[in-house]
């Protein structure tokens, strides 16, 4: 599926692209000549591994003597895998991940201008290049992006007598009560370890909260966040969400939505390609701004993943890394990855990958220009992100929202 859109908002041309990823193969150790490298890719869906295997075959055919060993890892295991790589000094040459600044702080990775050519660097859209810097220097290589909006099932809404998607939290609760009477799950709320930080971040930013204050200091336990988590706990306890949000992952509720079992949820641009179309291309659903507490200002979560290149063997791997990364970022290769998966493009050249389906992607592009991102430029984010994934859901189960957030705040302050 190849769809892409180029949208212009706030003076920025945002190129959109779809991506496809797959399963894992074995990783290998570097050859002494530096011509064999290891690439660890995150699994986005079942298309991930086939894409990378084909691209690597093509790369090796065009670059005799160079070899890329591939390992594809599920997102649920990625954090622990990366932690082990670093602790055992077995990090790959190239890693597809959602963090980078802690590696930059510890001088483990190449700067962006050391990892790719000037042509590739210039191709990154400024919005994403700016999110890939540590202390004013770009280290992360923008890989894919996504924006989050509110998905709702029109058929379920019709049965519940609801004519429009909710704009405020009060409306979310009111609509959820009506949907519950139809027998459907009112609201999908994934606070399990896959991406709890994203789900909670969506709700908190739409209540004036966030991870840091205006000065950039950690503010995980700020009043707005406590209020947000208390609200989500209320919805859970009133049976207005799926059972056990604290153990439910994003992909679980996305699948249930695709099956027509959930009335509404915070969704992602890749939902249609990765979840809805494979199950029911005729599903009647709509996309709307994310609800906010007051129903007037609607913030969007922007998500960006990166490629990072680790320094190894005194820099002996750099030439092979350069060749492989420059090969991937060629327009035809990057566009094909994006069109396989359904993500938004981070480069100018891949901006037409979604043009055949502009109507679907336009709201996401428009939202992305003003989106709020996780503080990935703060090396402490890796620790905070991990703590949120493991702990935030306990607050809607049997924990206390304020105490849970205080605990995560302590982790943040310790991380720096």
Give a label for each model feature.
Residues 131, 288-289, 338-387:
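Long, aromatic- and glycine/proline-rich binding clefts that accommodate carbohydrate-like moieties
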Residues 98-149, 167, 173, 179, ...:
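Hinge/lid segment of periplasmic solute-binding proteins
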Residues 57, 61, 160, 230, ...:
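Extracytoplasmic/periplasmic substrate-recognition and gating elements
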Residues 3-102, 164, 292-295, 316-320, ...:
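Conserved N-terminal structural module of periplasmic/extracytoplasmic solute-binding proteins
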Residues 139-143, 148, 170-219, 233, ...:
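Extracytoplasmic/periplasmic solute-binding protein
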Residues 158-159, 366-416:
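Conserved C-terminal helix/tail region of periplasmic/extracytoplasmic solute-binding proteins
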Residues 58-126, 133, 158-160, 164-167, ...:
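Extracytoplasmic "Venus flytrap"/periplasmic binding protein-like
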Residues 176, 217-246:
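Glycine-centered hinge/linker elements that transmit conformational signals in sensory
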């Amino acid at each position: 599926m190849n769809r892409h859109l180029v949208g212009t908002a706030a003076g920025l041309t945002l190129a959109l692209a779809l991506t496809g990823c797959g399963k894992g193969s074995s990783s290998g150790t570097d050859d002494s000549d530096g011509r064999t490298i290891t690439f660890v890719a995150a699994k986005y869906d079942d298309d991930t591994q086939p894409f990378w295997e084909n691209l690597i075959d093509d790369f090796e055919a065009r670059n005799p003597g160079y070899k890329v060993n591939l390992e594809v890892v599920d997102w649920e295991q990625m954090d622990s895998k990366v932690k082990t790589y670093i602790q055992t000094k077995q990090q790959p040459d190239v890693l597809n991940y959602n963090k980078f600044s802690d590696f930059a702080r510890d001088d483990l990775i190449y700067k962006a201008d050391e990892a790719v050519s000037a042509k590739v660097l210039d191709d990154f859209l400024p919005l994403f290049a700016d999110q890939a810097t540590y202390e004013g220097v770009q280290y992360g290589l923008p890989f894919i992006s996504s924006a989050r909006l509110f998905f709702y099932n029109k058929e379920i809404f019709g049965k519940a007598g609801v004519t429009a998607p909710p704009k405020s939290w009060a409306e979310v609760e009111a609509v959820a009560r009506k949907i519950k009477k139809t027998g459907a799950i009112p609201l999908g709320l994934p606070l399990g370890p896959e991406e709890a930080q994203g789900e909670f971040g969506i709700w908190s930013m739409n209540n004036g909260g966030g991870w840091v204050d205006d000065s950039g200091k950690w503010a995980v336990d700020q009043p707005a966040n406590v209020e947000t988590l208390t609200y989500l706990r209320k919805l859970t306890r009133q049976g207005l969400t799926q059972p056990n949000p604290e153990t439910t992952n994003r992909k679980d509720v996305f699948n249930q939505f695709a099956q027509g079992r959930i009335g509404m949820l915070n969704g992602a641009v890749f939902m249609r390609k990765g979840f809805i179309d494979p199950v029911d291309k005729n599903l009647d659903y709509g996309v709307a701004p994310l609800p906010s507490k007051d129903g007037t200002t609607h913030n969007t979560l922007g998500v960006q993943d990166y490629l990072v290149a680790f320094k190894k063997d005194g820099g002996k791997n750099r030439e092979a890394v350069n060749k492989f990364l420059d090969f991937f970022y060629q327009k035809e290769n990057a566009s094909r990855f994006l069109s396989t998966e359904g993500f938004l493009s981070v480069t100018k050249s891949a901006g037409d990958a979604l043009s055949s389906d502009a109507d679907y992607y336009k709201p996401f592009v428009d939202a992305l220009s003003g989106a709020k991102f996780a503080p990935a430029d703060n090396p402490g984010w890796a620790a905070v992100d991990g703590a949120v994934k493991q702990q935030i859901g306990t607050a809607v189960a049997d924990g206390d929202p304020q105490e849970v957030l205080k605990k995560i705040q302590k982790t943040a302050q310790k991380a720096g």
